A protein has these predicted regions:
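Conserved C-terminal beta-signal and adjacent last beta-strands/turns
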Residues: 8, 376, 388, 400, ...
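N-terminal periplasmic accessory domains that precede
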Residues: 85-88, 105-107, 132, 158-179, ...
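Short acidic/polar hinge/loop motifs at secondary-structure boundaries
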Residues: 97, 106, 122-148, 167-169, ...
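Transmembrane beta-barrel wall of Gram-negative outer-membrane proteins
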Residues: 176-178, 183-213, 218-255, 297-312
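Acidic/polar loop-and-plug regions of large Gram-negative outer-membrane beta-barrel proteins
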Residues: 232-234, 238-312, 330-378, 425-449, ...
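Structural signature of Gram-negative outer-membrane beta-barrels, strongest in the C-terminal barrel
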Residues: 236, 378, 397-409, 451-602, ...
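Membrane-embedded beta-barrel scaffold of Gram-negative outer-membrane proteins
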Residues: 312-314, 318-324, 328-334, 570-635, ...
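Gram-negative outer-membrane beta-barrel transporters
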Residues: 470, 599-601, 620-720, 781
Length: 784
């Protein structure tokens, strides 16, 4: 009698499923399709699921791919109490996340920012315009996948250092319930509820809800609320449906940090002796003190939905169409500048030198300047139509993927920058104490202008992984993109609200770009546990500069040029190429290692070099100055090791070396390129390191007792191109202990920043934000 057996295989980094096999039973061949079930004709079969990486879309074992990938499973996030992307990135070598303004998160991979973030394989298009933005919590996440190196061949523009893919929990037929409540330092309350199973007929579901509130250690209270629902299943033998809906409403405190570090060497007025060096922080500041205005706020409201349909014709062809829609609203008001009072007269106790004159400075009082009011409302439509499958030509097996991607981004940005008109109230003109910050009064706001932008992207792509033989694999991939952008600024709002009348199409300025991207690589597998690879790949990033009478333009050779007013392209796209070699080793479930050595070259970066109203060389500028400044590159290597010596114990370590520098900068009247060549690129540490250990006792009277600890290191980070300002390097240690009760409840105590390290990883200009000191989190979680 034959008994059917269904096995559900996870997609985590090292998950394998093993059943006991009869001698003489034939082995099941690997298939490139990521089937969720297998029908087995015998009750006893041996099967091992090769680790696959969804971000590459080919459904082949990771050992076949000439790329570097890393995966963080949800188990790691849960063990370490991680619910945000900045904490998760500490366990990804070569990745750094920096938060600014309290909630805007900027991700750099292998030294380059503007990195692409995806959710369930769908690009977050906010990165097409902005370099930082708030991001969702991670409570509904199954795993985080990182594809390093240029990825434009699969995901289009701007994928230079890599792509981060957030994979949310999929619907499953297995009934499950997960509930967690946690409470910790600074009134940190977290509640999460997840459940799922079979809904009716062929449909399964998975749902997750999360609420978090925290007073904050610097009186920076925050609230986060999110919900997620996934529905799906096999409608027939050939058809699958997957529907996902997510929403969030988050409130964040804006964050302007502590008063400025010293802008120059500071001297005492009484005797001209030096009091502080340039860059020193004032002594005696209360790091828990909050200097923001009482009226500051930041909301992020988001709704996203996707529908995926897949039809399988057979092993040779599978057609997939995925349509998604995202609405995102970032609503912000923040006082951004803490300025010391200054005077040309010797009325204060200190002064600094500006050229040949003395500027007297009051280090006891502050002026609250530049309250900034804006709201970005973005609507994105994304459709991916793909055909993939497997066929054979002679002795060569082909795993192919071809597709067409259409993306439309409609963004309306509203601003209220006219102080006194758009921002008003007693808090606008207040002055405060450096050592005793307090409320300066309320402020209210309105919008006066709207900035309207539209982006359209069409991508046509094809990739093929050729299995030449058991030991040699080859990847060939190409993509052609059409990109268009249009914008109009200064559109009047209606009654100060986030509303406007759409201007005529003739008032928009436009730019358009088309380009080809590629990736090619070889994999050699000398023995089953070891694979060696080499690859080369390219990327591009369109330039959205449009013509303006108020701007002067310089090319990458330092020469001024005068574009045509009707030109569709002012600057060439930013381009880059990566060469990479690496090795991957996996011995059963005991030991795994990944190593990669890379070089990335980037051309045509565009920057603002001077702003209208600035005084340069004694001249007050009547126009903005913008130009493509030259070339930079990133050289380095990544290493990650995981060792499981005994049952229940896992040790993982990772190290990233990333040396990103300016290599060629043309000199022009507004940029001294010679002094910048060789400087380190901003926001990227040279060294990053982590190690973590998870141990759970599986037998005896202490069965269910678990221990976790991690140590991370971040090297100093330069904050500017001139390499004059840095975030100092620091080590961080976290630890936790947990115990699983017989009733499926796990109790856990997390201690973060065990050694109370004093560190900085965030700043607003010269206003540094201190990191959180030692803190605790106690949680109880139930799983069924």
């Amino acid at each position: 009698m034959k008994l059917p057996l269904t096995l559900f295989f996870g997609l985590g980094l090292t998950l394998t499923t093993t059943l006991h096999a009869q001698d003489g039973q034939p082995k099941r061949e690997y298939t490139n399709f990521q089937d969720t079930t297998f029908q087995l004709s015998e009750i006893s079969v041996t099967a091992k699921r090769p680790m696959q990486v969804e971000v590459m879309k080919l459904g082949v074992p990771a050992a076949y791919l000439p790329v570097t990938t890393n995966t963080l499973p949800s188990r790691l996030l849960a063990n370490h109490g991680i619910t945000n992307i900045q904490d998760a990135a500490r366990f990804l070598p070569g990745v750094r996340v920096q938060t600014s303004y309290g909630a805007f998160q900027q991700i750099s991979i292998r030294g380059f920012d503007h990195s692409i973030i995806m959710v369930d394989g769908v690009r977050d298009e906010r990165s097409s315009i902005d370099n930082s933005y708030p991001f969702m919590d991670l409570t509904s996440v199954e795993r985080i996948e990182l594809l390093k190196g240029p990825a434009s061949v699969l995901y289009g523009q701007s994928a230079v250092g890599g792509v981060l893919n957030i994979v949310r929990k999929a619907p499953t037929a297995q009934q499950h319930v997960n509930a967690r409540v946690a409470y910790g330092s600074y009134q940190n309350l977290q509640t999460t509820l997840g459940f799922g199973g079979r809904l009716f007929g062929p449909l399964n579901y998975s749902a997750n809800f999360n609420y978090q509130t925290q007073d904050g250690w610097r009186d920076n209270a925050m609230r986060r609320l999110s919900g997620y629902l996934a529905l799906g299943g096999k409608l027939s033998e050939a058809d699958e449906l997957d529907i996902r809906i997510g929403a969030l409403r988050d409130f964040y405190p804006t964050e302007i940090g502590l008063p400025d570090v010293m802008p120059a060497d500071i001297y005492r007025t009484a005797d001209d002796t030096k009091a502080y060096d340039r860059g020193d922080m004032l002594p005696g500041l209360d790091k828990k003190a909050r200097y923001n205005s009482e009226s500051d706020f930041m909301y992020n409201r988001n709704f996203n939905a996707s529908v995926m349909w897949r039809h399988t014709f057979g092993e040779a062809a599978r057609l997939t169409d995925k349509l998604s829609y995202t609405y995102d609203d970032i609503d912000y008001f923040g006082t951004e500048d803490l300025a010391y009072l200054t005077s040309d007269k010797p009325i204060y106790k200190h002064y600094y030198k500006s050229g040949n004159r003395k500027v007297y400075i009051n280090l006891d009082s502050l002026r609250y300047d530049f309250p900034l009011r804006f709201e970005h409302i973005a609507r994105t439509w994304n459709n991916q139509l793909e055909l993939n499958g497997r066929f054979t030509t002679g002795s060569v097996k082909h795993n192919y993927l071809g597709g067409y991607s259409l993306i439309a981004l409609y963004r309306n940005s509203f601003s209220g920058y006219d102080l006194g008109q758009d921002v008003y109230g007693p808090g606008l003109t207040g002055q405060g104490s450096v050592y005793n910050p307090h409320s300066l009064g309320w402020m209210d706001t309105r919008f006066s202008k709207a900035f309207v932008s539209r982006i359209y992207m069409h991508g046509f792509y094809l990739q093929d992984l050729l299995e030449l033989n058991e030991k040699l694999k080859m990847l060939l991939a190409g993509r052609y993109d059409l990109y268009s952008y249009k914008r109009v600024s200064g559109v009047p709002t209606i009654d100060g609200r986030a509303e406007f009348e759409m201007p005529a199409d003739s008032l928009f300025t436009r730019t358009a770009t088309s380009t080809f991207s590629f990736r090619a690589g070889l994999v050699y597998i000398p023995t089953q546990p070891l694979s060696l690879f080499a690859s080369v790949g390219s990327y591009f990033k369109p330039d959205n500069t449009t013509y303006s009478d108020n701007t002067r333009y310089f090319d990458r050779n330092g020469r001024e040029f005068f574009p045509n007013k009707d030109s569709r392209k002012i600057f060439d796209p930013e381009r880059g190429i990566q060469v990479e070699v690496g090795a991957r080793y996996e011995l059963d479930d005991k030991l795994s290692a990944d190593f990669s050595l890379f070089y990335i070259n980037r051309e045509n970066e565009r920057q603002y070099m001077a702003y209208k109203g600035e005084v340069i060389n004694g001249e007050k500028l009547d126009k903005y100055v913008v130009g493509q400044v030259g070339r930079m590159d990133s050289r380095g290597f990544d290493l990650e090791l995981t060792y499981r010596p005994i049952r229940g114990l896992s040790l993982t370590a990772g190290y990233g070396y990333t040396d990103t520098r300016l290599r060629k900068i043309a000199t022009n009247p507004y940029l001294d390129g010679e002094n910048l060549v060789g400087k380190r690129y901003a926001n990227s540490p040279l060294h990053s390191f982590y190690v973590y250990a998870d141990y759970t006792i599986r037998e005896g009277v202490l069965r269910g007792l678990g221990f976790n600890f991690d140590v991370t290191y971040q090297d100093e980070v330069y904050r500017d191109f001139s390499n004059t300002s840095t975030f100092p390097s620091y080590w961080m240690t976290d630890a936790s202990i947990s115990y699983r009760l017989p009733n499926r409840v796990r109790l856990r105590l997390n201690v973060n920043n065990v050694f109370n390290t004093d560190y900085y990883n965030e700043a607003l200009d010269s206003q540094y934000v201190p990191g959180m000191p030692r803190n605790f989190l106690i949680s109880a979680a139930y799983s069924l």
